[in-house]
Amino acid sequence: MNGLQDLDWIAVDWGTTNLRVWAMDAASRVLGNGGSAEGMGTLDRAGFEPALMRLIGGWLPAEGRVPVVACGMVGSRQGWVEAPYRPVPCVPLAKGQMARPDTRDTRLAVQVVPGLKQDHPADVMRGEETQIAGLLARQPDFDGVLCLPGTH
């Protein structure tokens, strides 16, 4: 058997210092996960795809394309492909509106989620908003405070 059985898509949280990946099925259940210290800050543009493939290569089928949805510093100016910040408030992106880096491996359909920014008070998020959206999708009645510490 080639690849991870029931793999539907791959979630990626790619920060400055760490890379984390999750294999997901069609119901968004986690099938497997991995991580490395190959954060955006350790790579040049040519290094992103190889770093990702070191973690997910064994999950991919021999043929076909797998959606890979990435958030975090991977979408910064210094990242794999720039996904410019979106001003808030904003509506969710429609399918196909995320940044797409070029890939050599034809099995990868990588999309990078943009960060969010507000002017008053000035602040930005790149990756955290995606994690919050995931929590709210699973717990729509959540009423509390979230603390998502990063490495900088």
Per-region residue spans from a language model:
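Short glycine-aspartate micro-motif
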Residues: W9-D13, P67-V69, G144-L148
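Short beta-strand-loop/turn "lid" adjacent to the catalytic site in phosphate-handling enzymes
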Residues: W59-M125
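Short glycine-rich, Thr/Ser-proximal phosphate-binding strand/loop in the N-terminal lobe
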Residues: W9-G47
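Conserved phosphate-binding catalytic cores of ATP/NTP-utilizing and phosphoryl-transfer enzymes
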Residues: N2-D6, R107-V145
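Short, well-ordered amphipathic alpha-helical segments that serve as non-catalytic structural scaffolds
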Residues: A46-W59
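Non-catalytic, solvent-exposed interaction/assembly segments
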Residues: A27, L52-M53, V66-V69
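A short acidic Gly-Thr/Ser loop motif
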Residues: V12-N18, M73, L148-H152
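Secondary-structure boundary elements
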Residues: A26-R29, P61-A62, A137-V145
